[in-house]
A protein has these predicted regions:
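A structural signal for well-ordered alpha-helical scaffolds and beta->alpha junctions
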Residues: 7, 43-46, 76, 126-132, ...
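Conserved AdoMet/S-adenosylmethionine-binding subsite of the radical SAM
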Residues: 73-185, 189-191
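Short aromatic-enriched loop/helix-cap "lid" or pocket-rim segments at secondary-structure transitions
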Residues: 23-25, 76, 105-106, 129-130, ...
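Accessory C-terminal segments flanking Radical SAM cores
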Residues: 159-260
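Flexible, charged surface loops at secondary-structure boundaries
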Residues: 55-58, 109-111, 217-218
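Conserved alpha-helical substructure of the radical SAM core
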Residues: 1-104
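General structural signal for secondary-structure boundaries
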Residues: 38-45, 105-106, 131, 196, ...
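Charge-rich, solvent-exposed alpha-helical interaction surfaces
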Residues: 49, 108, 253-256
Length: 260
């Protein structure tokens, strides 16, 4: 059985804990209802997920480790070491808000291929502080760094005024279909929204079915209920005092690297 690489970028959610409380977070405040839609995985859970790829001799073009805030996971170092040892991922990425760059976390992050730092209004100075710090110089010399600005959140399921929507148009205009696939113990999703809704899952049953599912360019059944582009709203916090405190702590952590 020859190896096959599944195209696109796949999300692996390893924790439901975060040091920010974003209103409308797609995995921790779904539909602004407080619903948590992602898992909390141990190292053994991650091993079980990756074992399904190994069983079918499948690889991923990119795997993104997500939370919550993944740097808060106590087993993050072991999880990254294990994934890299399996040779099942061509590019290993971690998505973080950049507010927990402790010495131990930074040592772990140097093993990655790519880091995506999400920047929120409360911590918008993080790019400037990070890029001017010794930490920024050190990490960017080893790992590719991207910044994702989160001034606005999509309100999934809500239409923008003045636009036509239908199943095909929603699919064609969707930003999720290649970059926000999800892999978990149950199987694979082609979209983080269907993952949150627990719809359109391809289980770990048959290699060719998995390949056909991921390679398909046919809209999902849920696309008709998911207008794209969705209505947007300005980023807000559900807990301003805690988020401000954690943002200041995170920025100070980065600044301390300039003193080392």
């Amino acid at each position: 059985m020859l190896p096959f690489t599944l195209n696109g970028s796949f999300d692996l959610h390893i924790t439901d804990y975060c040091n920010l409380h974003c209103k409308g977070c797609v995995v921790l405040d779904y539909n602004q209802s407080g619903e948590v839609t992602n898992e909390k995985y141990t190292l053994d859970n991650v091993i079980d997920v990756i074992s399904n790829l190994k069983k079918f001799n499948l690889k991923l073009e990119e795997l993104k480790i997500l939370g919550g805030e993944p740097t808060l996971h106590t087993d993050l170092n072991q999880i990254i070491d294990y994934i890299k040892s399996t040779n099942t991922v061509e590019k290993l990425t971690l998505v973080t808000n950049g507010l927990n760059f402790t010495k131990e976390v930074v040592e772990t992050l140097t093993k990655l291929d790519r880091i995506i730092i999400s920047i929120y209004p409360m911590s918008r100075s993080i790019e400037s502080v990070f890029s001017k710090s010794k930490l920024g110089d050190m990490l960017s010399s080893k790992v590719h760094i991207d910044y994702l600005y989160q001034e606005y959140f999509f309100l999934y399921g809500y239409k923008q005024d003045g636009l036509e929507y239908n199943n095909e148009l929603n699919w064609k205009r969707c930003l999720q279909k290649n970059d926000c696939r999800v892999i978990n113990l149950d199987g694979l999703y082609r979209c983080t929204i269907t993952y949150s809704e627990k719809k359109n899952l391809c289980e770990w049953n048959n290699r060719q079915e998995i390949i056909d599912f991921i390679e398909s360019d046919i809209p999902l059944s849920h696309c008709k209920d998911c207008p794209m582009p969705a209505k947007t709203t300005k980023w807000e916090t559900n807990n301003s005092p805690i988020d401000l405190k954690n943002s200041m702590r995170g920025l100070n952590l980065i600044k301390t690297w300039s003193q080392k």
